Structure formats: C-alpha cells, structure tokens
C-alpha cells in the first residue's frame, strides 16, 4: 500500500512538473515573441515573413519527430491540465520566476539594442578602416558574446527547456538552422558558438553595419539551437576567414534560400577607397621625374640652358641628332632637377642670328609672341613677328633674376640679350618715334637687375676659324639652308628656327609654291644668321655692341682636344676627339696665328676664354662681379664634352660629366649671395 502511495505521489509530481512545463511554454513563448517584436521593430516585412516561414518549417519537423518517437504531446498535455489546480503554489512561484526572467531578458535586449546602435555609429565612422582591424574587432566581439552567453545561461537555467521548445517557433534571421533533440547541452553550446561565428564571418566582406548587427543579436539569441555538421568538425574563426566564400551551409533547402535572400536584401557592398588607392599608387610609383617644390630648390634664381648653333630641343630636332644637353650619357636638366636645382632648356632658332635668338630667348622666359622689332625686320627683310611662347618665368622683371648658361654660340646669344635688357635698341626706339606703332619692352631698355650670372661653355667670343674657312662659304650655307627648306614642309615637326625668313610651308600652300617662295627669300644673301655671327668679323661686331654689367657674375669654361705635331708647330686632333670635328680641328690647328691653333675641334682656346675687348681675370674661390672669370682650360675636352653628346667617347665618363655640372650649379648658388639685391 505504501509503495502504491509512493507511486501515486511520484506520478502526481511528474504530472505537476509537466503542467508547469506546459504553462511556461505558453507564457514564455508569448512574452518572448513580444520581446522580439520590440527589438526587431525596425526590421523589414521581408525579415518577418522569412522568420515565420522558417519557424513553421521547424514546427513541422518537430511534429514529425514527436510522431516518430510515439509521443502524443497533445493528449499528454490535456491529461496534465486536469491536475493544474492541484499545485497552485508551485505554479505561482514558477510564474513569478518566469516573469523575472523575462524582465531580465527585456533589459538585456534593450542593452543589446543600445550596443548595436553604438556599434553601427562606430562602424560608420570607420568605414575606411583596415580590414585587418575589422577582423580583430569581430573576433573580440565574438569572445565578448561568448562570455555574455555564459552569464545569460546561468540566469535562465530554470527556463532552459521552455526556451528550447519555443525557439522553433521564433527562430530569428541570424540563426537559420536547428539542433536535433538528441544532442546534449554541451553539444548545443558548442554548435551555437560555431554557427554564430560562422554567420558573423559570412557577413564580414559585406557592409560592416550588418556584421555588427549580427554581433549584437548573438547575445540576444544565446539559447538558439543549430544543427551540427555531419562530421561534427570543430571550426575556428581563422578557418572561417580562409573560407569566406563558402560558409557553413544550412541543412534544409528552404532555410538556405531564405537565409541567402535575407542577406542579399540587407547587404551593401563596401567598395575600395579609390582616392586612397591612387595616393598609394603615387607614393609607390617612380619618383625619377618628380619636380621639387620651389622652396626646396637650392637655387633661388632659375637656371636657363641656352643651346648653340645647330641646337635643338627634343620636340623639334631631327632624329639623327642626339639629345643636346647630355646626349646618351645623361639628361643634364633632369639631373639638376633631381639634385635640387631648378633648370630649363631654352628652345630658340638653330641657325638664326644672335640678335634673333636673343629676342626669342627673352620671350621664351617671359612668354608672349616674338617681336623681332619693326626696324630690324625692315632692315633685313624678314617677318617682324615669330612664334608664341608660353613663358617659363612670366613674372620675370627687374629684381627677379635668372642664371643664363650658354654652350658655344649660346654664350654670345646671352650677352646680346643682356645688352638689350639693360640698354635697349637705339634703332627700334628711333624707328618707333618716326613711324609710331608698338615697341617691345625689350627694346626700351632700363631692364637691369634681371640676370644674376652669365656662364659660357666653349663659346667663340671672338669668332672661330671654322666659320671663316668653311661655315661662311656660299656652298656650305646653301647646303644648310636647303636642308632647312626641306624640313620646313608643313608635315615636318623639325624646326630650324627660320620661319621669319619664310622657310616654313603655309597650311594651304602647295610644296611647289613653297619652294618658289623660298627662292626669293633674303636669307641667302643676308648676314642676319648664325653663320656670319660665328665668324671673327661677326663676333668682333658683337663685342663692340656689348659691355660688361657691373652687377653680373661672368665665368667662362674652355676645353682643348689637340696636341702639337711632331715636326711642326701645328696642332693635330686628339684620337678621342668627336669624329665630325676632326677636320675642323685640324684646319684650326693650321691657322696663320699660332695663338689660335689650340682648339676643341670648333673653337680656339683663345676665343673661348673671354672677349678681347673686355676685362678678365683668372677664376678663384672669390666671386667677382663685372669681370670675366676665366677657369683653367680643361685638357682632352672637345667642344661637345661639356654637354656629353659624344657617346663613343670612353675617356669622358658620365660620372665626370655629372660632377662638372653639379659643381657648376653649386657655383651659381654661391653667386646669389653676391648678386641678391634683396639682402642688401
């Protein structure tokens, strides 16, 4: 009898417990749904439909499971309900505990919602953050979620069973799979961690706000159940990172489709920062041709390189000619830039006179359309106006200076320009007074204090026998001008700088008409060209018209590449002389005046050192103004060694050429301490 009573009491206890579980099922289920509605109020209607369809699917699966195990849940619930009133005290106590638990959950939900908003704001501020930093943040959030989950599990231990049953009807979008009832709690906990980490890593390549939402929802849904992989292999965060393109798949087809659709609807692609990529590419790119800022240059006054006779810049030169400033050895101007010196290559006429070239040099620096002057154009019979230059130093004026460095005839051209700036052109001034009209500021004079220094390299200040004996012959001039005429056609890019003489085909002019017109040009009988100015007569005329400026530093560099013959006083060309100059070098070496024989292949040493009628001194460390400072003659240096055009010369190396120009540029910077009027 006693055993029967014990059995009845045990049966009663089981029945009361079942009633309690059923009651908690309905109460907590309704309250959990209310809590989820509050948290997910902002979610789209699509999320709600998706979650409901998933819940329905899982409910059907649970029903099937119960039928397979022979459990009649409905009948069992009805039998237990009849005895509900037998233990009101226990039921009320459990109701109270359930209410307290739901309140705690609602508080946690509110905290999670606030944390979610904060994470979204932080993520918005750091959209351009390093992906590595984002990964670290996600891992930290996962760890925090795990810790929060353990604490939450301890608080809700009493209602664990009811939560597990209710989860099937209220499974949120963050966890799309479920666990089999046969799994124990430790397996459930492990699989919850894996799936939540998987979901976070799956969203990581997408919008960071979505990823942070999942971290927050991870804490809210810490009791949700997932179905394990068949092989039950433990996954780590690092494994998931390496397989972001193939995350853990849901076990059901409907779950897979619903999950993917929700991700597609809420995902926003995070595009690379294009500006950052461009800045990085620039930073890593080649810096060879980078131009330093004005404040970073060693020289205050720009250096302007002025080429000589038959000189061109690369954009207009015949293809058979090497780069003028450096040849194949180096680009002198670019090398100066790379080493902190602001420098330019002037582009002026290759065969024009010193006067025409000086005018062109002025406009090359200042900018504007070339005006050769009305009087000059009328005197020599060519066009008054020439090409238009953009200008490299548009603010060039008294007080704003430049360094002028001229090679060969370029040294004469520089001297002519300085004379025009300081004293103007008396002929142009008189012509303008008589005929009125405009006059270029260059010809008015009173433009002193615009040149800091004048440096010449192998310049025939007193002319050269090479031009006297060969260059000024009618046959030679005819050949050269014919070449200029040929390259003057409208389809040619080569420019000999003789357009003012008509040696440039007009756009609508046939080539036959162009040739006929050129034959009538005054160029063929004029002295207004480079051939004449390079003769000793032409150079002497320039020396009479020019003078030294007491405010300018003058310096000359001279080379020689000949040696005395064995049986005479004549000079013979050295073996390493630039081959085209061997003939002219030997001709000059036979000159009647012995002092003119030593030469660099084109220019005699005595002519390159200084103009005969102007003061000079040997160059020293002391910088002097208003006088030619003559540097020691550089032996075994021919006419083009100063500019590195002889690529076959193994004696003169690139390093030697580079050292020469660095030393020259450094000297120019030192002269600014003497010529800078701003310091006075």
UniProtKB/Swiss-Prot annotation:
Subcellular location per the Swiss-Prot or TrEMBL entry: Secreted
Parts forming coiled coils: none
Segment forming the signal sequence: 1-34
Region of interest: Disordered: 39-58, 82-260
GO biological process: lipid catabolic process
This enzyme's EC code(s): 3.1.1.3
Compositionally skewed regions (Basic and acidic residues) per UniProt: 84-112, 224-234
Residues annotated as the enzyme's active site: 408 (nucleophile), 600 (charge relay system), 639 (charge relay system)
Polar residues biased stretches: 40-58, 162-193, 204-223, 235-246
Class in the EC hierarchy, top level: hydrolase
Domain of life: Bacteria
Keywords linked to the UniProt accession: Calcium, Hydrolase, Lipid degradation, Lipid metabolism, Metal-binding, Secreted, Signal, Zymogen
Coarse class of the protein's main subcellular location: secreted
PANTHER family named in the record: ALPHA/BETA-HYDROLASES SUPERFAMILY PROTEIN (PTHR34043), ALPHA_BETA-HYDROLASES SUPERFAMILY PROTEIN (PTHR34043:SF3)
NCBIfam families: lipase_YSIRK_Sa (NF047351), YSIRK_signal (TIGR01168)
Name of the featured protein: Lipase 1
UniProt source species: Staphylococcus aureus (strain MRSA252)
């Amino acid at each position: 009898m006693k055993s029967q009573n014990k059995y009845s009491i045990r049966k009663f206890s089981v029945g009361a417990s079942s009633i309690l579980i059923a009651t908690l099922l309905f109460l907590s289920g309704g309250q959990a749904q209310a809590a989820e509605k509050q948290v997910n109020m902002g979610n789209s209607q699509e999320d709600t439909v998706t979650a409901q369809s998933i819940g329905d699917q899982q409910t059907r699966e649970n029903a099937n499971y119960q039928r397979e195990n022979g459990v009649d849940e409905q009948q069992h619930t009805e039998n237990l309900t009849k005895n509900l009133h037998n233990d009101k005290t226990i039921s009320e106590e459990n109701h109270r505990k359930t209410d307290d638990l739901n309140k705690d959950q609602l508080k946690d939900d509110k905290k999670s919602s606030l944390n979610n908003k904060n994470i979204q704001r932080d993520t918005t501020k750091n959209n351009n953050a390093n992906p590595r930093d984002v990964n670290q943040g996600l891992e930290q959030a996962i760890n925090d979620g795990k810790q929060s989950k353990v604490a939450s599990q301890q608080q809700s231990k009493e209602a664990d069973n009811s939560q597990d049953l209710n989860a099937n009807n209220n499974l949120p979008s963050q966890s799309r799979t479920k666990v089999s009832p046969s799994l124990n709690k430790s397996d459930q906990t492990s699989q919850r961690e894996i799936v939540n980490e998987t979901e976070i890593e799956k969203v990581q390549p997408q919008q960071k706000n979505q990823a942070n939402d999942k971290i927050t929802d991870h804490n809210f849904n810490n009791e949700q159940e997932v179905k394990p992989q068949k092989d039950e292999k433990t996954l780590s965060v690092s494994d998931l990172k390496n397989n972001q393109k193939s995350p853990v798949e849901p076990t059901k087809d409907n779950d897979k489709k619903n999950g993917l659709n929700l991700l597609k609807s809420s995902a926003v692609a995070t595009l690379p920062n294009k500006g950052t990529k461009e800045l990085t590419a620039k930073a890593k790119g080649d810096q060879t041709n980078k131009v330093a800022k004005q404040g970073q240059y060693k020289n205050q006054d720009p250096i302007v390189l002025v080429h000589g006779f038959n000189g061109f810049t690369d954009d207009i030169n015949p293809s058979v000619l090497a780069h003028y400033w450096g040849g194949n050895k180096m680009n002198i101007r670019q090398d100066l830039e790379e080493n902190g010196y602001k420098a330019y290559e002037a582009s002026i006429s290759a065969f024009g006179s010193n006067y025409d070239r000086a005018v062109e040099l002025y406009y090359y620096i200042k900018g504007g359309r070339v005006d050769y002057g009305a009087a000059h154009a009328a005197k020599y019979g060519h066009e008054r106006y020439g090409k238009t230059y953009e200008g490299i130093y548009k603010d060039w004026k008294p007080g704003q200076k430049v360094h002028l460095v001229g090679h060969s005839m370029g040294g004469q051209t520089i001297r002519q320009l300085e004379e025009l700036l300081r004293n103007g052109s008396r002929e142009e001034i008189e012509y303008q007074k008589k005929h009125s009209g405009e006059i270029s500021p260059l010809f008015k004079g009173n433009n002193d204090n615009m040149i800091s220094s004048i440096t010449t390299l192998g310049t025939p200040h007193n002319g050269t026998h090479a031009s006297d004996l060969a260059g000024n012959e009618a046959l030679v001039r005819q050949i050269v001008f014919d070449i200029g005429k040929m390259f003057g056609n409208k389809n040619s890019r080569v420019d000999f700088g003789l357009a003012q003489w008509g040696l440039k085909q007009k756009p609508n002019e046939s080539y036959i008409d162009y040739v006929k017109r050129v034959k009538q040009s005054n160029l063929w009988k004029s002295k207004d060209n480079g051939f004449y100015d390079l003769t000793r007569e032409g150079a002497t005329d320039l020396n009479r018209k020019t003078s030294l400026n007491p405010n300018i530093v003058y310096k000359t560099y001279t080379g020689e590449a000949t040696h005395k013959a064995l049986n005479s006083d004549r000079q013979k060309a050295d073996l390493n002389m630039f081959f085209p100059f061997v003939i002219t070098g030997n001709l000059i070496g036979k000159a009647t005046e012995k002092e003119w024989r030593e030469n660099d292949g084109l220019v005699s040493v005595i002519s390159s050192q200084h103009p005969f009628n102007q003061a000079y001194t040997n160059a020293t460390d002391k910088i002097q103004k208003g006088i030619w400072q003559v540097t020691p003659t550089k032996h075994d240096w021919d006419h083009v060694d100063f500019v590195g055009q002889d690529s076959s010369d193994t004696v003169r190396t690139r390093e030697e050429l580079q050292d020469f120009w660095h030393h020259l540029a450094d000297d120019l910077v030192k002269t600014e301490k003497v010529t800078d009027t701003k310091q006075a």
